[in-house]
Amino acid sequence: MSGAGLELDGVWRRFPSGEDEVAVLKNVTLSIAPGEMVAIVGASGSGKSTLMNILGCLDQPSVGRYRVAGQDAGCLDGDQLAALRRGHFGFIFQRYHLLPHLSALDNVAMPAVYAGMALHQRRERARALLARLGLAGKEHHRPGQLSGGQQQRVSIARALMNGGRIILADEPTGALDSHSGEEVMRILKELNAAGHTVIIVTHDPAIAAQTERVIEIRDGEILRDSGAPAREAASQATEAQPDGGPLLRERLAEAFKMAMLAMSANRLRTALTMLGIVIGIASVVSVIAIGEGSRDYVLKGIREMGTQTITVFRGKDWGDDKADGVRTFLPGDVAALEGEGYVDSVTPETAQAQRIRYRNVDVNASVIGVGRDFFRVQGMKLAEGQSFSRDDIHFQRQVVVLDKNSRRKLFGDGEAVGRVILVGMVPATVIGVVAQRDRGFGGNSLQMWMPYSTAASRLFGQQHFDRFVIRVKDGQPTKLAEKAIGALLTQRHGGKDFFTYNMDEILKTVESSSRALSLLLALVAVISLVVGGIGVMNIMLVSVTERTREIGIRMAVGARQGDVLQQFLTEAVLVCLVGGAIGVALSYGVSFVFSLFVTEWKMSLSPPVIALAVACSSLIGVLFGFLPARNAAKLNPIDALARE
């Protein structure tokens, strides 16, 4: 076995006591050679446990030097000390210190996780060690299913997992019956014969008598040392595995597994912790989905009224009393606008209310004179029949296109296309019916459309129009087109007697306002998510307190501060992710119920919203889990192991 001698030179260990300090170890100088079997004996409070803690790199001297295989432990930081524990030491405790929620196999394999051993290798080695100690077939038993002697043998196997060049046994037989105690001592002697250095801390002279060397300590000082260091034993001990530190994948897998076990062990508490996250995520997702759905509903309605369109009205602005006196909107303007390169299509519009009759049905409807491109400009589709042709406009044909309301009122379920109705005093043939729009825009009023030439000459008795609607070609900026239209009409009319209404600008304004409102609502909902995150932090702080001994055990077998931090951070993130997933599922449930009561529009649960929920869950887990995880990582292993 390669040398791993232990040397203490003038070691003092002091602890604060009020305003003073108490010396527990006083000027201890000691050497233990590789391969020795040593007993450290003393009464309770003599300092023997403190000495063992320093020997095992769980604690450091206040004064003096401690070397392990020539390496000064006082010059090492926490992670380097953890590596030293992993590579050289194996601990056997009086109360076994096995993790109750892990199987015997997993308890034994735990040190190898932090040493970076691959999963299959550490499982094979753990099985071999358990079989070597007479525990074959007990691999999947938990500590509560094993006797005291069996638990101590599991503890011994764990001490050997990374090689265990130096075995530190603290009262290894103290909690066992005589038979089990004898069995444990037999195993320790065999390990010493195989080349392991075995150091036993005990108050029992009968146990001490079975070792090669006895060191008696009283009031922090070495009272008696039975002999000089023994010669180094033959090299038969299993060497520790090369320690490159735990692989990230192995560390994450172990952290995930332990997080699942911790959640399973406290199901009610985990469920209550998740509840805050579930409500928070469901609130945020639902509010955003409602906001997005309502925005889409409004914007779709606006688009159905015509996109890429600019409407030119008579007068200076809305409410202009002189608007009705403007007579400059003429067919020549339509021709001039159609000649512009940025214009896709143009339609004039003139509207009047007229009585409509068909057989015994007599209703009042809005009759609108339009151009042949009206339905294209407005983005309207025909459910039946056809639209107006160029000849319909040119020859002032008496034809009409109905909306769905007019069709239903006049014809019910009967045929509409081809029927002749009376518009005012003018007979007109129905050539088409406009499809019902999904939105509620337009209400329940009755509308129908005629060629503007027919309406002007046969119904309205006027040649001027009320307005123009211009559809701008795709890719052309509507803002620039609006300016060009204004300049053209100002020149033709000899002045500006009109104003324009840019539908795309309105669309952008509505979209911006909707997003701002959605963001405001989401920020309100985020408050519940923050409250849930605080709940996670509180529960994780409680969990750290409850699992302090587990943290100490993990540190004793070689876990670094980063490993402990990652362990508890993973648990917090996992709780939040599971809560987030349930929250998203709940949002889908809310969306389904919402659709039962609101049929006009739907909540918009888009992939970005779901991704946002997952990101929020992870972020909450990291932010609110970091403080408890950091507290766990900063625990002193001695204090942690001593916690009941």
UniProtKB/Swiss-Prot annotation:
Q: Which Pfam families match?
A: ABC_tran (PF00005), FtsX (PF02687), MacB_PCD (PF12704)
Q: Cite the InterPro entries for this sequence.
A: AAA+_ATPase, ABC3_permease_C, ABC_transporter-like_ATP-bd, ABC_transporter-like_CS, MacB-like_ATP-bd, MacB_PCD, Macrolide_Exporter_MacB, P-loop_NTPase
Q: Which keywords fit this entry according to its UniProt record?
A: Antibiotic resistance, ATP-binding, Cell inner membrane, Cell membrane, Membrane, Nucleotide-binding, Translocase, Transmembrane, Transmembrane helix, Transport
Q: Which GO terms describe its cellular component?
A: plasma membrane
Report the membrane topology from the UniProt record.
Multi-pass membrane protein
Domain ABC transporter, by residue range, is 6-244
Residues spanning the membrane: 271-291, 415-435, 517-537, 574-594, 609-629
User: According to the UniProt entry, what is the EC number of this protein?
Assistant: 7.6.2.-
> What biological-process GO terms show up in the record?
response to antibiotic
Where ATP is bound, by residue? G42, A43, S44, G45, S46, G47, K48, S49
Q: Where in the cell is it found?
A: Cell inner membrane
What GO molecular function terms would the record report?
ATP binding; ATP hydrolysis activity; transmembrane transporter activity
Which CDD domains does the annotation name?
ABC_MJ0796_LolCDE_FtsE
Assembly description: Homodimer.
| Family recorded in the similarity comment | Belongs to the ABC transporter superfamily. Macrolide exporter (TC 3.A.1.122) family.
Its biological purpose is as follows:
Non-canonical ABC transporter that contains transmembrane domains (TMD), which form a pore in the inner membrane, and an ATP-binding domain (NBD), which is responsible for energy generation. Confers resistance against macrolides.
- The identity of this protein, by name, is Macrolide export ATP-binding/permease protein MacB
Q: What is the lineage of its organism?
A: Bacteria, Pseudomonadati, Pseudomonadota, Betaproteobacteria, Neisseriales
